[in-house]
């Protein structure tokens, strides 16, 4: 029998419908894989009993011919999504053993469509990080290794658990969130596909907030088709989220294999960085040639305010985080450390509950919002954000269908290798991705090649607002040209 954990989500869906195997068998195969891969630390909570119950229910629905689009498909859920009655911590000590009394809109839509919950996935604490090293549960280990090396590598962040679990065959797909690259960067580091949809495409209700004007949920999966299938279930209007946009959800899967003939693909000159590795530059040009061979037209474009995006992002995001994280005080839920009075209790709780990177960003955010610095920093960053958005609008107004860039400035690096003395070194990982969040646009990362040490590298496609379909069509061209990337199993 085929190893059920090696199937794509689309193959598993078809196998379930054709009765080649049952949802319970598919779920059990993934639960066994999770148990054998605990060294990767991808899951922070496993839910085997719940998973089997959901799989049995899916089998019953399939038998009656009433299975939903994801009936029996085992998924992992980033620990930022509220799951009713199931521990949700954002991988922070401050939330302790919090069990939400409600379900996030995105996960409730996945369960509505018949998906199975395997467990909660590791992430950077409150989604603040680019390497999944800030989690209170410890770092996630990338299933990929450098050729001939046993050095443990990061999977990227903040959705490192999601990307590692998908790459290692520990789920058929995973939910993730992206505030400045947290879907696309880990996807690139693990040879998986990750799409950050247009801001407002997926509901943020029930997702622990980092920076509310930047956060967006999306899927990580093994193929472009799988990510399209998942986004179809995750997307949709939600009146409970004031930033949710009321637009019909297209059939994203139908975009796979769609013609890209005549599409204009922008190559932004500002993304050619000084000191960019030759491998990344070569891969970028190779991706452009693949799209050209499929009938697309390449045009050089200019996004002049790109160089200001990273500093502006690291003002806007911490400012919003400092406001959002003020709700964690130990009074109604989560960890509480008592003090002589309520102010001391707040101080003790936050000192013990928040990790170092979260504290750093709260401090930065509070500083840039303070009376003396608001105009100099926060207001100026918002003006830069408007200019970045305008750059993209002008580009798309010239008939450009999508923009092709590298996804990351390097392949995965070693755990503990970056950001120790200088946090900016870590922040630079987001250099190709933050502009997309600042402008509220959709972006997809697709694996496109390997570096000299055999590690996967990804390319990013940036699209017009609510035109994820074009990204899926173009992403499919890259995937068909580059092939799929699967790590050699060393952990079991």
From Swiss-Prot:
Task: Cite the InterPro entries for this sequence.
Answer: Amidase (IPR000120), Amidase_CS (IPR020556), Amidase_dom (IPR023631), AS_sf (IPR036928), GatA (IPR004412)
Source species, domain of life: Bacteria
- Uppermost EC category: ligase
Q: What is its EC number?
A: 6.3.5.7
Protein keywords: ATP-binding, Ligase, Nucleotide-binding, Protein biosynthesis
Reactions it catalyzes = L-glutamyl-tRNA(Gln) + L-glutamine + ATP + H2O = L-glutaminyl-tRNA(Gln) + L-glutamate + ADP + phosphate + H(+)
A Pfam family reported for this protein in Swiss-Prot or TrEMBL: Amidase
**GO BP annotations listed:** translation
Q: How does it assemble?
A: Heterotrimer of A, B and C subunits.
**Stated family:** Belongs to the amidase family. GatA subfamily.
The protein's name in its UniProt record: Glutamyl-tRNA(Gln) amidotransferase subunit A
């Amino acid at each position: 029998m085929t190893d059920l954990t090696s199937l794509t989500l689309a193959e598993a869906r078809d196998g379930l419908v054709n009765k080649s195997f049952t949802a319970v068998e598919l779920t059990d195969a993934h639960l066994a894989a999770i148990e054998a891969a605990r060294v990767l630390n991808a899951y922070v909570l496993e839910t085997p009993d719940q998973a089997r119950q959901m799989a049995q229910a899916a089998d019953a629905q399939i038998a009656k011919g009433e299975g939903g689009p994801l009936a029996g498909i085992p998924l992992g859920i980033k620990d930022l999504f509220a799951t009713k009655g199931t521990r949700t911590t954002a991988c922070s000590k401050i939330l302790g053993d919090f069990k939400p009394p409600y379900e996030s809109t995105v996960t409730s839509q996945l369960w509505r469509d018949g998906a199975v919950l395997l467990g909660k996935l590791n992430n950077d604490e409150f989604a603040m990080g680019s390497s999944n090293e800030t989690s209170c549960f410890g770092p996630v280990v990338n299933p990929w290794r450098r050729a001939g090396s046993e050095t443990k590598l990061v999977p990227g962040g903040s959705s490192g658990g999601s990307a590692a679990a998908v790459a290692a065959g520990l789920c058929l797909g995973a939910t993730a969130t992206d505030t400045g690259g947290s879907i696309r960067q880990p996807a690139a580091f693990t040879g998986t596909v990750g799409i950050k949809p247009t801001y407002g495409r997926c509901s943020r209700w029930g997702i622990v907030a980092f920076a509310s004007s930047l956060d967006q949920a999306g899927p990580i999966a093994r193929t472009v088709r799988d990510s399209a299938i998942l986004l179809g279930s995750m997307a949709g209007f939600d009146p409970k989220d004031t930033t949710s946009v009321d637009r019909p959800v297209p059939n994203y899967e139908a975009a796979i294999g769609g013609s890209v003939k005549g599409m204009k693909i922008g190559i932004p000159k500002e993304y050619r960085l000084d000191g960019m590795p030759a491998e990344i530059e070569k891969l970028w040009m190779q991706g452009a040639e693949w799209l050209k061979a499929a009938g697309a037209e390449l045009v050089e474009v200019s996004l002049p305010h790109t160089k200001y995006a990273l500093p502006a992002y690291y003002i806007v995001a911490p400012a919003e985080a400092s406001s959002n994280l003020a709700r964690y005080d130990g009074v109604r839920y989560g960890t509480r450390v008592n003090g002589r009075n309520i102010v001391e209790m707040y101080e003790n709780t936050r000192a013990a509950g928040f990790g170092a990177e979260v504290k750093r960003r709260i401090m930065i955010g509070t500083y840039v919002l303070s009376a003396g610095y608001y105009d100099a920093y926060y207001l100026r960053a918002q003006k830069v954000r408007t200019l970045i958005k305008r750059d993209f609008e002008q580009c798309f107004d010239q008939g450009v269908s999508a923009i092709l860039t590298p996804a990351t400035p390097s392949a995965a690096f070693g755990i503990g290798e970056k950001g120790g003395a200088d946090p900016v070194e870590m922040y630079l990982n987001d250099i190709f991705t933050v502009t997309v969040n600042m402008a509220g646009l959709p972006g997809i990362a697709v694996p496109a090649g390997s570096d000299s040490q055999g590690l996967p590298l990804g390319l990013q496609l940036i699209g017009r607002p609510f035109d994820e379909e074009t990204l899926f069509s173009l992403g499919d061209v890259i995937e068909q040209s580059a092939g799929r990337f699967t790590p050699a199993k060393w952990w079991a």
